[in-house]
């Protein structure tokens, strides 16, 4: 054996700072809420909270499906075709990541104004803008990982391009596409900035957390935060696990 | 049956130039060339996967250049076999049949039939990644043959297999050909495959098809120095083997192993030694030969020898040429060890 690899220990020590930094607030908020159980029970029975949670889950799910519906075909084109301006299209897809989300809200409102103002459409519009890149890029990576020769063989055996897509490319890229859908869903659930500007109503849980904090303070906003996190995390973890099993 | 007319194509680093040849019904046509010569691109143009910049492809006189792959009824087996990893072996083989709207019972029967012929009927429920290389290749061939294609397009079908599996599959390929009666275009860099399976061969070098013809003719009479250098094996003899003896005209050549029937053997020019008088050694093939040509290659000299009608080329050093005093038209003895003979199965 060689001597101890101190460099790796050093890196591990530095790296664990970030892991602890992410885990610590999550554990803390759950722990503190556990001590204040009464408030949690009260919140669970608050119809306003339940309504907001329902709104969040519905809009995020709708957004994930819409981003897949449009993102999967786009991902396929990006994976399979070379065309002029492809780099430009790829850059546009990544733009939402760099725009501050409040600015996204302003842009959407300037562009679509009353059509999306304070409506479910508005929530979904805001979510779609910030989450679509996840769906598109995962779909593209999924299709890139499918050997093009498989499609060629399917074609020579008599399958049209569309038939080949549905019987070969799509099933093989499905785990990657699904994980893109989950990321889009998770990104939608965590969106606040753009929704705040475009559609304060109908009220979503993310917005409600902020409203309770502004109006009633930390103690009132904490239980909703915990519930929102519990739901998001468990769905996220469950879906990831499901994909992992399918991949096996 | 298939006519390829002046196909040209620039594709990535490959440049195909003015490629023309034709394939006859029931023929096993080999496209032989080193890697990077553009063989795969040519095959994919014929399959309809890549469209050519110029030129036409005719199937029984009908122009199919613009047809998509699914309308050509050619089966394509890429070098990596491209088995569908998410389907069982059964579903892989059944893929083309299902697309042809054949009733399910009929599909199952046909799959079983072809799987039996190829010796893979015990693997039908398995997923491709659990199979060995040789088994995967059989599945790919079964999937291609079951749809009764007009043309079977094979890209380096044996390149990824170990030597034993390879020679076994080559032998079986001949049997399957009799059984299914397919016409094939087979792309390879292996002389062994060309000589064992090919009826005719096209030599492809740097994007051009430089010589097309009968396998034996191309190997024995390369049209250009380029082809000759690529083929390396200059002495290809065809004869009828009976155990360890190969009969070629009046000659009896001792072989390194037992073979029966029509075979081709190759001897490298550097493996032939020249004597002025016949020496009797049991382990050697010794034949009287007439020197028909002497070609100076620098340190080496290439002799063209006539062994009772069979032309062999031999390399000797310049000093032994002088020592032996060999001149054109003279009678010498050519000898080569049985172990220096390469038998093409």
From Swiss-Prot, chain A:
Primary location recorded for the protein, binned into one broad class: membrane
Name assigned to this protein: Molybdate/tungstate transport system permease protein WtpB
Entry function: Part of the ABC transporter complex WtpABC involved in molybdate/tungstate import. Probably responsible for the translocation of the substrate across the membrane.
Residues annotated as transmembrane: 10-30, 57-77, 92-112, 116-136, 165-185, 224-244
Ranges of the Extracellular topological domain: 31-56, 113-115, 186-223
This protein's GO CC annotations: plasma membrane
Compartment list: Cell membrane
Membrane topology, as annotated: Multi-pass membrane protein
GO biological process: transmembrane transport
Bridged cysteine pairs (disulfide): none
Subunit structure and binding partners: The complex is composed of two ATP-binding proteins (WtpC), two transmembrane proteins (WtpB) and a solute-binding protein (WtpA).
Organism listed in the record: Pyrococcus horikoshii (strain ATCC 700860 / DSM 12428 / JCM 9974 / NBRC 100139 / OT-3)
UniProt keyword terms in alphabetical order: Cell membrane, Membrane, Molybdenum, Transmembrane, Transmembrane helix, Transport
UniProtKB/Swiss-Prot annotation, chain B:
Binding site for ATP: 33-40
Recorded GO CC terms: plasma membrane
InterPro entries, alphabetized: AAA+_ATPase, ABC_SmlMolc_Importer, ABC_transporter-like_ATP-bd, ABC_transporter-like_CS, Mo/tungstate-bd_C_term_dom, Molybdate/tungstate_ABC-ATPase, Mop_domain, P-loop_NTPase
One Gene Ontology term from the biological process aspect of the record: molybdate ion transport
Swiss-Prot/TrEMBL catalytic activity: tungstate(in) + ATP + H2O = tungstate(out) + ADP + phosphate + H(+)
Quaternary assembly: The complex is composed of two ATP-binding proteins (WtpC), two transmembrane proteins (WtpB) and a solute-binding protein (WtpA).
Protein name, entry field: Molybdate/tungstate import ATP-binding protein WtpC
Gene: wtpC
């Amino acid at each position: 054996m060689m001597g101890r690899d101190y460099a790796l220990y050093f890196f591990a020590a530095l790296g664990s700072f970030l892991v602890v930094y992410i885990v610590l607030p999550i554990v803390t908020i759950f722990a503190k809420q556990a001590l204040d159980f009464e408030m949690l029970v009260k919140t669970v029975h608050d119809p306003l909270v339940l309504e907001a949670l329902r709104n969040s889950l519905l809009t995020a799910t709708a957004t994930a499906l819409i981003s897949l519906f449009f993102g999967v075909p786009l991902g396929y084109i990006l994976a399979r075709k070379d065309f002029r301006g492809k780099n430009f299209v790829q850059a546009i897809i990544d733009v939402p990541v760099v725009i501050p989300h409040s600015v996204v809200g302003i842009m959407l409102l300037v562009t679509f104004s009353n059509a999306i103002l304070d409506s479910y459409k508005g929530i979904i519009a805001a979510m779609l803008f910030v989450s679509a890149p996840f769906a598109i890029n995962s779909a593209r990576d999924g299709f890139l990982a499918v050997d093009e020769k498989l499609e060629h063989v399917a074609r020579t055996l008599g399958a049209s391009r569309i038939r080949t897509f549905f019987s070969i490319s799509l099933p093989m890229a499905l785990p990657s596409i699904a994980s893109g859908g989950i990321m889009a869903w998770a990104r939608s659930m965590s969106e606040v900035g753009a929704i705040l500007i475009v559609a304060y109503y109908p009220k979503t849980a993310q917005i409600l957390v902020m409203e309770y904090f502004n109006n009633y303070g930390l103690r009132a906003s904490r239980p909703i935060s915990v519930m929102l996190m519990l739901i998001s995390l468990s769905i996220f973890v469950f879906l990831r696990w499901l994909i992992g099993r399918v991949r096996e | 049956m298939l006519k390829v007319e002046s196909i040209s194509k620039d594709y990535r680093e490959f440049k195909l130039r003015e490629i023309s040849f034709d394939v006859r019904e029931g023929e096993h046509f080999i496209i032989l060339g080193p890697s990077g010569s553009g063989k795969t691109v040519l095959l994919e143009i014929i399959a309809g996967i890549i469209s050519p910049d110029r030129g036409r492809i005719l199937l029984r006189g009908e122009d199919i250049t613009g047809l998509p792959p699914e309308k050509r009824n050619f089966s394509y087996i890429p070098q990596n076999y491209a088995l569908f990893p998410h389907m069982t072996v059964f579903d892989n083989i059944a893929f083309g049949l299902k697309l042809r709207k054949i009733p399910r019972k009929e599909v199952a029967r046909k799959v079983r039939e072809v799987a039996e012929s190829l010796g893979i009927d015990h693997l039908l429920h398995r997923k491709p990644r659990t199979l060995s290389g040789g088994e995967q290749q059989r599945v790919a061939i079964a999937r291609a043959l079951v749809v009764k294609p007009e043309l079977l397009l094979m890209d380096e079908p044996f390149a990824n297999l170990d030597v034993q599996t390879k020679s076994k599959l080559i032998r079986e390929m001949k049997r399957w050909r009799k059984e299914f009666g397919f016409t094939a275009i087979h792309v390879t860099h292996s002389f062994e495959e060309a000589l064992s399976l090919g009826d005719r061969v096209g030599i492809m070098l740097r994007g051009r098809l430089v010589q097309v013809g009968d396998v034996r003719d191309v190997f024995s009479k390369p049209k250009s120095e380029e082809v000759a250098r690529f083929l390396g094996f200059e002495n290809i003899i065809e004869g009828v083997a009976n155990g360890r003896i190969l009969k070629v005209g009046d000659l009896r050549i001792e072989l390194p192993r037992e073979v029966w029937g029509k075979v081709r053997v190759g001897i490298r020019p550097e493996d032939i030694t020249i004597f002025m008088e016949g020496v009797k050694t049991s382990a050697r093939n010794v034949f009287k030969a007439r020197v028909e040509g002497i070609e100076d290659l620098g340190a080496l000299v290439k002799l063209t020898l006539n062994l009772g009608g069979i032309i062999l080329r031999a390399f000797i050093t310049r000093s032994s040429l002088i020592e032996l005093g060999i001149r054109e038209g003279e009678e010498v003895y050519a000898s080569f060890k049985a172990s220096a003979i390469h038998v093409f199965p």
